[in-house]
Structure formats: C-alpha cells, structure tokens
C-alpha cells in the first residue's frame, strides 16, 4: 500500500487533441495549462492504483524519484500511462491483469473526463507493456461505458463487462485489485445510467481519439478481443477432490464460515480469488466448482463488510486502508482525525485531515501497548472537538482493532472481555493477534492498578457493574446515582434498605473489609481481617432499651426503633466515615470510613421519595451507643479513627474565616449553592458563630411560642464526616421515630440563618435534627417569628471579635465529633458539660433559660434528659412538652455523671490534641502566619500544638518516632500530610480544658447585646478548670475502658 503523487507533463497528444477539438471554448487553453501543472496522487495496492481526489494540494505532492518501496513497478507504469492521455483526461483507476504471455504486463485503465454539461464520462482502456521494465506503452482496447453496461463475476477470479453487444473478461492479479475495480466500475455505470449515455449520442465522442491511438501488437489486440475465450492461467482444482460428493445447503454454510476465516488470515493484495477457492477446497476436502458463483458473491460480501468502516462509538470509526483512502466517504461521515496504525500505509490526505501515526507491523512481537496512551489522547481530542476519528490499519482486523479495544477499556473502565466483545459485535472481523491479546491483558492490569491508586482510595466500591464516570462523583450528579447506590428503593416496607438488612431478608453478618478485598465477603474469617458488628451491638441494644425514658415511648410508635435509631449508627459510621488504616488490628474501619468522607453532605437535592427511603435506612443504621468490644480494639479504633488523613479537597478556610461583615443570609446563600465545588468534609466552626449552642438554647426557649416550622423555614444540612447522608424531605407517619421536641426546636430555628456546616455540633445532633426536619414538615406552618434571626445577627457581630479565644473551643468540639465515632462521646460530652457548669463571670447569662438548656443541646446517645443536675429543675419547670410528646426527668443522669469523673483533663487534652481531619489541623504545616507559629495568650502556636498531637499519638499507639514517620510519608502522598521539622520536637503543652473554659465564658458573654467580658487570665482559668491528672497517660487500663 502506497501513496504516490505524479506530475502531469506536456505530451505529444496535446497538440493533436487541441486540433481535433477546435470546437471547445476559448477558455479551455487556460484549463489545459492548469492541468499541466497539477499533481495527481494515487492510492496504490498491489496490482491497482486508485486516483485520489486531492487536486493540487501542495501537502500531498511527492517526488517520483523516491517511490514507495511497497508500490513495486506500478508508479513507473502509471507515469507512462498518464503521459499517454490528453491533458483534460484523468485516470480514475488502473488495475493490473493476468496475461497469457509471461513477459507482458496488461492494465485495465478507467479514464474519465468532464463532458459538455460538466457530467462525468468514463471509458475503459486496455494498455500493454512489452515488459516490466518498459518505458513505453500502447493502447490495445477502447470500451465505452454506456448506460446498458452490466458487470458479472465469472466465478474464476475475474469479472466480465458487457455493453452495446460487446463483452470482455478481466482477471485482476489480486482480490484487493478486483475489489477496487468492481467499486469504481459500479459507480461509473451508475453515472452512465443516470445521464443516459447511449451509442450515437453526443456523449463519449472523445473516445474516438483513443481509438485512433490503438497501436499494440496484433497478438495483444487479439488477447483483448478474445477475452471471452481466454482460459485462466491458474491451475485447476486438484484432481484429488474431483469425485467428492457435495450437499448444497450444508456445504454453503461451511463455505461461509471457512471463507471468512481464510480471507481474514490472507493478504488480499497477494492472492487471487482462485487461490482462496483452492484453499477453501483443501480445508473442506471437497470440490467446489459448482459453488464458484456462490463463493465469489460471499467473497464480495465479506470484502464489502471489511471495506465499510465500523462505527464503534459516536466519535470513533474502525476501518481499513480502503476507508482511509475514500475521501468522499470520510467527508460524508464527518471524520476529521485519522489514526494510522501501520508502517506500510501512507497518510493519503495530509492537507485535509489531522493524522497521527503509530508505525508498527502486524506481528506478535510488536510493542503496541506503548502507543495506546497517545492514541487515547488523540481520539479524545477528536471527541472534545465534536468531530470523529477513523482508526485504521491495513484491514481493520488486528492492529487498529486492538487499539480501539484498549481505548474502550481506558475510556469506559471496561474489562478486557467486555471491551473485546463490544468491538467484535460492532465489527465482526475483529481479531487481534496473540501478541496483542497478551498486551491487552497486561493493559487491563495496568488500568486496574491505576484505578486502585486514584479512584478506589477515596470512592465507595460500586455495587454494580455500571461504569463510574468521573462526573458521577460531583455534587451535581450524586443525586442521579442514588438509584444505583440503593438497590431496593422501591421496596415499600423498607425502602433504601438492602435485602440482606431488611427484616425479611437473610441475616448476613455485617463486616468490615480490607482495602485489598475487592468485594464484601461475609464468609472471610481470617484473624484481624473482618470485624463482626453483631456482638458489638447486642449490649448496646439492651442498654439503650433499658435506659430510654417512658415518655419517649409515647412519642415513638415502635419502641424498639428508638434504640435502633442510635444502635445502627456505629455500623454506618465505621463503614463510611474513615480514611486510612492506623494499625493492623482494624484496617477495615479506616478503609471503609474513607469511602464515605468525600460524599459527606452532598445529598441536598434528593426527591421526597428518595429521601424518605434514605431516612428509613438511616434510622436502621444509627448507633451511637456503647460497644461491648475488647479494650484494645476500642483503643485502636479510637486512635486509628482520630488519626485519619483527610482527602485533599478544597480547603475549608473560607468556611471557617469569612468576613465578619457578612450577614447570616449571605452565608446561607453561599452554602446552599448546589454547584459549589468547595465541600467541607468536617464541621467547620466560624469564629463569630461558635456560640451556636447558645443559639440552639435561645431557640429552644421559644419552643412554646412556635410549635412547628414548615418546610419553607428549613434548609438542608451539611453533615459532618461520619454522618452518611442528610435526610431533608418529609416522610410518612411512622416511617421513622420522631425525635424529641428538645432537639426539634433548635434545628428549626437555626437552620434558617446559619450555614449548614455550622448548625450542629456533633454527629448525633445531626442525625436527630435531620429526623426532626422530616417530622417538622408534616405539621402546619404557623407565622414565622423573626426574633431568633435578629438575635443570631447579634451573635454574628459580637463573636466576630474573639476568633482567638474561640479557636480552642472549636478544636475541642471537633474532637467530640471524632470521639463519637469511636464510641466515646458519652464520657467526653459529660466532661464538657461538667466543665461548662462551673461558675463563670456572667451569672446573668446563666440565669437565662437558654443558658440552662445549653447542655441539653448536646444529647447523649438517644437520651433526652438534661445533662447537668444543677440545671434540671429550671429546665424541667420552664420547658413544657410540645404536643404532649416529651417530659424530662431531672435525675436520670446522676449515676452517669459520677462515672465520667474518672476522666481527667489531661486525658481530654490528649484526645483533643489528637489530630483530626479538620481544616485547622490539615493546614498547619502550610501556614506561615504569626498565629500558627507564635504563642497566643501564653499558649503555644498551632504548629507547636500539632507537634504535641503527633508525639502524643505516637506514644499512645506504642510506636517509635521512625516507624510512623515512614508510614506518614506514604500517607502524605495521598492525603497531603506534610511533616515539618517542628513536628517531631515540641514541648509539653498546657491543658486545653482551660481553653474550652475560656471559650465557654466567651460564649456566655457573647449572648448579651454588647461584648462585656474582658479577656481572662489563662492561669486563673486553668485553676478554676480543675485537676490535672498526668497519671491518665500512665494508666492504659483506664484508657481502654474509655
């Protein structure tokens, strides 16, 4: 296969042509001169040359002195034949034919010109060369193609052309040459029929010039005129198979199957149809003379299928060299990009199309895999430009087909088998050689490894075989993926709940899987591998059912679900909340937790039906209760979860430190933008909204004034990491246990003004408040009370002046969220409540009923009683049941408060300083501000704090400095966790409980109309905050019990 460009030159026939056609217009001289300078490019196969409709494109010109090495002597013969023509005539096709004389070379040439009415007129010329090295040729036959021209296959490797009573038989030297001749002749006959060319008319008069030029030897002329009596020079079928019987239909079916296999394995440029038939007879072991016509027709059918490019995708064609040379077809199909996967085939139209060459041969040892990446980008370039790309090799069977299969595997994430079957279905002759199949298998492993690195680390494992496009994981498209992630949404009894978890389904154990496990396999039971949750939850179920107040049973239709609301949360959080394995004892917890982190807070626009399903699933998977697991397991889970690395999403600094002059409505609009790309995976606490627990309390004090809030007054939540999905839309009665009104009211009030990431201070509040949103929407909506929003604006302006004081409280409250994942939130919350109940500088704020209910806004694993006994009487007297659904018991938490006194502030300091995935800790090493480096109010800067965190974590995990340092460097590649030189050398820090006490007092004062509290002495605060128990770090048993 070659592309050869020849230059037209003046010929002796030009003068005679001009004299014999003096009736032509005067402008024909200019046209003739233009034709003399035109280059003519030909698409060449062995035995045939097809003119390319390229005109005088300068990019396509080539020098004849350097013919293509695969073109043979055809370019020289073609140049001689061009010089034989008139200047206005063109060669459309030249096909080499067999001859009875071994030293002679014969060509059937299709010559065309533009007629009087700019119509195409075609004739056939028989051209003879005395030898292969001859520099001259003669014309031995001229055949006009009239409108009655008919073409038939002779069944012996040739075809006959009959017109106006004359018939000639032509036998091309190869199947490919015959196929090219048949296509060109078919189009020429169509033109003759359309314009009704008939003998005696004005058409084809110019053929008389060539008839006058017939000058071949008489033996050659006789050969052209006696073609109907010419026997093929090929040997007949072997006599061995002459007497074998045949069975019609059965034989035809075998012929179809074997003929396709033979043609796909043969070089059609170097074999004839007779040779293919002989090979077919050998394989079928029978004589096929009576099936010659059937074989030729099937051969043409197969050639037609191989000739037509196959549309694999909307932007991708797979074809052969013939398709790459068919300009009309390329332009008609909208192809602008051509990927040439051959070494022996040229680019035919370099001035018209964008080409990319992969110069390889079709051999098993060829390294095609190295080129698939560049081929992928080239094809996608055509896709991005809304165009189409043709990928071709010689036949469109092996090299180009392998490239298209590799493209499908990478573009759509398909396995090799699926991609191969898909391309095979679109183009049935697809058959990569054995070497390319091995490379495709290797390429599949490379792509799988790449998915493990880049996709599966931060993505939930898909539950089906659908292709996961990158856009499916954006916030805008996650709603559309809801049906795929929740297979049983249309289950009316338990919507959104997998069958294995539904009450009627099989009771499969819920396990955690390793990062290397491709599927969730319940039957795996290796040591340290799978952690079954059933035993961890039985005690929690019993304990929660016993401790639940009687009044709550009045509210919840199904008493058992009140405990399940909290019970299943551990499973959900451990399954979807964490990021990295901390130790070998619990690798699955962090691996499954990291899958959920990127998706936190992205389910804002789900429909009512889907959210009702999600709500039921959430209620069946909530578990904040205590876990009866071994002490070492709980400790490892605690410190493994707290040390997880956050995926590198957009920083939450904008959420944490916006401008102080912004209004609550401005923050509301900014956080509710569904197209926003900044997704906070952790709850962020603005400096001027750190008093949101007080805002909760103030709204709770107004609960009797406003019994319920309609859906218009609520807004979606952005849940913290550890929460799975927010439940915003309403659900039917009884779909989920309705939470107590003490949590319902604050969520209603604050959701209107606060950003979604600031409304709730721990995951348990998130769950309950989200459920209360649902129940709130079922109630009628009274007139909105504008007073809470006004107070909140006051809070915004007051607290904007104390970012330093409240930053430590932010860290403390974020640690609550992380501790709750490990099942330690009860003790930590009690300690915080006990600290907040100590005397403060603002008694007026404490006397306010809102302050008295501050602790109640931090609930305790499903129990709705007040947290501190000193505030119970006032809370119980002022807070009336809403709709008769809630009554508080002021004494139910006294035993639990005594239990939490074992925890010292040093231990809480250790936990509080344990690194979390908040935006503060993740940005420490990248911060160069004075707040991060220098001390603030006698306390070390954030960099020193982080050094303290890292050293504390290493000591409690029983590790040396070098071992986690190496591990952290590997984690840094994925989670942007960078170590500085100060990370490993830090002095002991003071207790952070004093910080939280300072922040608490600042909160109380900020609730007043004017900021009245002056900065307090940190030393004095430390004294008032109570004891310091360094022995807590020395006592691992007490840590284990926590």
UniProtKB/Swiss-Prot annotation:
First-level EC class: hydrolase
Annotated region described as Interaction with YWHAG, given as residue ranges: 889-1042
Family matches, as Gene3D superfamilies: Homeodomain-like, Protein tyrosine phosphatase superfamily
Disordered: region residues: 1-29, 576-609, 668-766, 858-900, 915-942, 985-1042
Keyword Cytoplasm listed: yes
GO CC annotations, alphabetized: cell leading edge; cleavage furrow; cytoplasm; cytoskeleton; growth cone; midbody; synapse
GO biological process: actin cytoskeleton organization; cell morphogenesis; cellular response to ATP; excitatory chemical synaptic transmission; negative regulation of actin filament polymerization; positive regulation of AMPA glutamate receptor clustering; positive regulation of excitatory postsynaptic potential; positive regulation of synaptic plasticity
Main location: cytoplasm
Occurrences of domain DEK-C (ranges): 249-304
Enzyme Commission number(s): 3.1.3.16, 3.1.3.48
SUPFAM superfamilies in the record: (Phosphotyrosine protein) phosphatases II, DEK C-terminal domain
Function, as annotated: Protein phosphatase which regulates actin filament dynamics. Dephosphorylates and activates the actin binding/depolymerizing factor cofilin, which subsequently binds to actin filaments and stimulates their disassembly. Inhibitory phosphorylation of cofilin is mediated by LIMK1, which may also be dephosphorylated and inactivated by this protein.
Protein name: Protein phosphatase Slingshot homolog 1
């Amino acid at each position: 296969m070659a592309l050869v460009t020849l230059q037209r030159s003046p010929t002796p026939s030009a003068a005679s042509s001009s004299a014999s056609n003096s009736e032509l217009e005067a402008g024909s001289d200019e046209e003739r001169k233009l034709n003399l300078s035109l280059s003519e490019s030909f698409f060449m196969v062995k035995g045939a040359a097809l003119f390319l409709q390229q005109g005088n494109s300068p990019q396509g010109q080539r020098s004849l002195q350097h013919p293509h090495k695969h073109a043979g002597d055809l370019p020289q013969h073609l140049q001689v034949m061009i010089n034989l023509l008139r200047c206005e005539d063109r060669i459309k096709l030249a096909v080499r034919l067999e001859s009875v004389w071994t030293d002679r070379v014969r060509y059937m040439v299709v010559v065309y010109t533009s007629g009087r009415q700019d119509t195409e007129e075609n004739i056939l010329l028989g051209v003879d060369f005395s030898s292969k090295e001859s520099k001259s040729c003669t014309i031995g036959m001229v055949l006009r193609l009239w409108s009655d021209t008919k073409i038939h296959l002779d069944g012996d490797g040739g075809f006959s052309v009959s017109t106006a009573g004359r018939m000639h038989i032509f036998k091309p030297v190869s199947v490919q040459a015959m196929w090219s001749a048949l296509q060109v002749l078919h189009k020429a006959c169509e033109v003759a029929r359309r314009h009704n060319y008939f003998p005696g008319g004005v058409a084809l008069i110019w053929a008389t010039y060539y008839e006058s030029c017939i000058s071949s030897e008489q033996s050659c002329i006789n050969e052209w005129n006696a073609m109907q009596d010419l026997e093929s020079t090929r040997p007949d079928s072997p006599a061995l198979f002459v007497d074998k019987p045949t069975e019609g239909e059965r034989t035809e079916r075998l012929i179809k199957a074997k003929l396709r296999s033979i043609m796909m394995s043969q070089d059609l440029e170097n074999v004839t149809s007779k040779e293919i038939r002989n090979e077919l007879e050998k394989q079928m072991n029978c004589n096929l003379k009576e099936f010659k016509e059937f074989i030729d027709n099937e051969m043409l059918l197969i050639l037609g299928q191989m000739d037509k490019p196959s549309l694999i995708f909307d932007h991708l064609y797979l074809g052969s060299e013939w398709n790459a040379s068919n300009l009309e077809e390329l332009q008609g199909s909208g192809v602008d990009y051509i990927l040439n996967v051959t070494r022996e085939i040229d680019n035919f139209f370099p001035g018209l199309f964008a080409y990319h060459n992969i110069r390889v041969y079709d051999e098993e040892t060829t390294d095609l895999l190295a080129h698939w990446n560049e081929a992928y980008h080239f094809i996608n370039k055509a896709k991005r430009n809304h165009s189409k790309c043709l990928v071709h090799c010689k036949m469109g069977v092996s090299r180009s087909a392998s490239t298209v299969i590799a493209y499908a595997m990478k573009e759509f994430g398909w396995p090799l088998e699926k991609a191969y079957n898909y391309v095979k279905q679109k183009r049935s002759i697809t058959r990569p050689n054995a070497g390319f199949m091995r490379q495709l298998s290797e390429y599949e492993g490379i792509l799988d490894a790449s998915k493990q690195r880049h996709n599966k680390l931060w993505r939930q494992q898909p539950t089906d075989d659908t292709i996961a496009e990158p856009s499916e994981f954006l916030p805008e498209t996650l709603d559309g993926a809801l049906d795929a992630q929740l297979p049983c949404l249309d289950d009316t009894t338990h919507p959104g709940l997998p069958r294995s978890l539904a009450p009627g389904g099989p009771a499969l154990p819920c396990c955690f899987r390793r990062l290397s496990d491709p599927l969730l396999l319940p039957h795996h039971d290796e040591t340290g591998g799978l952690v079954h949750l059933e035993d961890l939850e039985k005690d929690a179920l019993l304990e929660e059912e016993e401790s639940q107040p009687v009044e709550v049973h009045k509210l919840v239709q199904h008493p058992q679900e009140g405990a399940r609301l909290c019970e299943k949360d551990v499973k959900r959080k451990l399954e979807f909340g964490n990021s990295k394995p901390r130790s070998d004892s619990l690798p699955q917890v962090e691996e499954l937790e990291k899958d959920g982190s990127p998706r936190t807070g992205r389910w804002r626009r789900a429909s009512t039906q889907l959210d009702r399903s999600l709500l039921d699933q959430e209620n069946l998977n909530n578990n904040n209760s205590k876990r009866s697991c071994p002490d070492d397991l709980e400790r490892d889970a605690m410190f493994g979860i707290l040390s997880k690395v956050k995926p590198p999403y957009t920083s939450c600094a904008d959420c944490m430190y916006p401008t102080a002059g912004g209004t609550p409505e401005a923050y509301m609009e900014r956080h509710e933008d569904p197209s926003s790309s900044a997704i906070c995976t952790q709850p962020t606490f603005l400096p001027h909204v750190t008093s949101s627990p007080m805002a909760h309390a103030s709204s709770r004090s107004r609960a009797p004034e406003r019994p319920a809030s309609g859906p218009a007054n609520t807004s979606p939540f952005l849940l913290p990491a550890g929460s799975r999905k927010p439940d915003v839309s309403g659900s039917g009665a009884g779909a989920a246990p309705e939470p107590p009104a003490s949590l319902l009211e604050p969520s209603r009030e604050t959701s209107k003004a606060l950003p979604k990431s600031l409304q709730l201070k721990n995951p348990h509040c998130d769950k309950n408040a989200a459920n209360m949103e649902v129940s709130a929407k079922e109630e009628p909506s009274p007139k909105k009370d504008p007073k809470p929003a006004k107070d909140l604006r006051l809070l915004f302006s007051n607290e904007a002046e104390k970012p330093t004081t409240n930053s430590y409280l932010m860290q403390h409250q974020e640690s609550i969220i992380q501790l709750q994942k490990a099942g330690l939130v009860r003790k930590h919350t009690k300690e915080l409540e006990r600290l907040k109940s100590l005397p403060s500088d603002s008694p007026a704020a404490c006397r306010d009923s809102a302050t008295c209910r501050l602790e109640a806004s931090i609930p305790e694993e499903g129990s709705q009683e007040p947290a501190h006994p000193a505030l119970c009487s006032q809370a119980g007297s002022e807070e009336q049941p809403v709709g008769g659904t809630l009554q508080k018991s002021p004494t139910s938490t006294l035993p639990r408060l005594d239990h939490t006194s074992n925890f010292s502030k040093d231990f809480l300091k250790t936990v509080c300083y344990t690194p979390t995935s908040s935006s503060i800790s993740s940005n420490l090493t990248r911060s160069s501000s004075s707040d991060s480096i220098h001390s603030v109010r006698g306390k070390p800067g954030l960099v020193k704090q982080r050094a303290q965190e890292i050293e504390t974590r290493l000591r409690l995990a029983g590790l040396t400095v070098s071992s986690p340092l190496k591990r952290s460097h590997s984690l840094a590649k994925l989670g942007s966790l960078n170590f500085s030189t100060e990370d490993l050398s830090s002095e002991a820090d003071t207790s952070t409980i004093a910080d939280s006490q300072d922040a608490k007092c600042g909160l109380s004062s900020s609730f007043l109309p004017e900021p009245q509290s002056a900065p307090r002495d940190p030393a004095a605060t430390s004294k008032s905050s109570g004891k310091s128990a360094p022995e807590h770090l020395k006592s691992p048993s007490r840590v284990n019990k926590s």
